């Protein structure tokens, strides 16, 4: 009986996570007997409350690739510090491969102004007001990783105040 309850708790924890597939691509590998086909899935996992991760999964079928992508995304979760207006604390940039992403905080009511994979990452991270721009590449995997890289570099108000040696109240005066 105790095992069953524990399993239910684990399922409840899993239901708080949302996952969105960014891309499914059929890929092939040349082997001695010809071409071996498989699928690659790029998946973003987040709880819309400050945690997000990007995962990649490969398998012989689409469902298996998505499942592996979700597992990989949960291994690569990051914490995102958000303001009371559900925006980011300061301007930030991120890069991965040839992709670059610039993110700027926005006023309440602005919404998520971003495109493609970056928009998906921001929505699943719980960001509600932000301006973002993709530069350099239209590759969904590199853009998603660049967005995560940009969110990783964010610092909270308390971290900035501590580095400057002032209190949070005196940070902007």
Swiss-Prot record:
InterPro entries per record: Ribosomal_Su5_D2-typ_SF (IPR020568), Ribosomal_uS5 (IPR000851), Ribosomal_uS5_bac-type (IPR005712), Ribosomal_uS5_C (IPR005324), Ribosomal_uS5_N (IPR013810), Ribosomal_uS5_N_CS (IPR018192), Ribsml_uS5_D2-typ_fold_subgr (IPR014721)
Record has Iron-sulfur as a keyword: no
Gene Ontology terms describing biological process: translation
GO cellular component: small ribosomal subunit
Keyword annotations: Ribonucleoprotein, Ribosomal protein, RNA-binding, rRNA-binding
Molecular function GO labels: rRNA binding; structural constituent of ribosome
Every S5 DRBM domain range: 17-80
Family: Belongs to the universal ribosomal protein uS5 family.
Entry note about domains: The N-terminal domain interacts with the head of the 30S subunit; the C-terminal domain interacts with the body and contacts protein S4. The interaction surface between S4 and S5 is involved in control of translational fidelity.
Function: With S4 and S12 plays an important role in translational accuracy.
PANTHER family named in the record: MITOCHONDRIAL RIBOSOMAL PROTEIN S5 (PTHR48277:SF1)
Protein name: Small ribosomal subunit protein uS5
Gene encoding the protein: rpsE
């Amino acid at each position: 009986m105790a095992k069953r309850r524990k399993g239910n708790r684990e399922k409840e924890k899993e239901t708080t996570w949302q996952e969105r597939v960014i891309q499914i691509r059929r890929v092939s590998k040349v082997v001695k007997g010809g071409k071996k086909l498989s699928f690659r899935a790029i998946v973003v996992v987040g709880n819309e409350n400050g945690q997000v991760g990007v995962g990649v999964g490969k398998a012989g079928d689409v469902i298996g690739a998505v499942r592996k992508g979700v597992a990989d995304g949960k291994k690569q979760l990051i914490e995102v510090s958000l303001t009371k207006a559900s925006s980011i604390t300061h301007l930030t940039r991120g890069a991965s491969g040839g992709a670059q992403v610039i993110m700027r905080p926005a006023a309440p009511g602005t919404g998520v102004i971003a495109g493609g994979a970056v928009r998906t990452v921001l929505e699943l991270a719980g960001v509600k007001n932000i301006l973002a721009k993709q530069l350099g590449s239209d590759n969904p995997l590199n853009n998603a990783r660049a967005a995560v890289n940009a969110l990783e570099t964010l610092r909270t108000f308390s971290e900035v105040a501590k580095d400057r040696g002032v209190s949070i109240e005196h940070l902007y005066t």
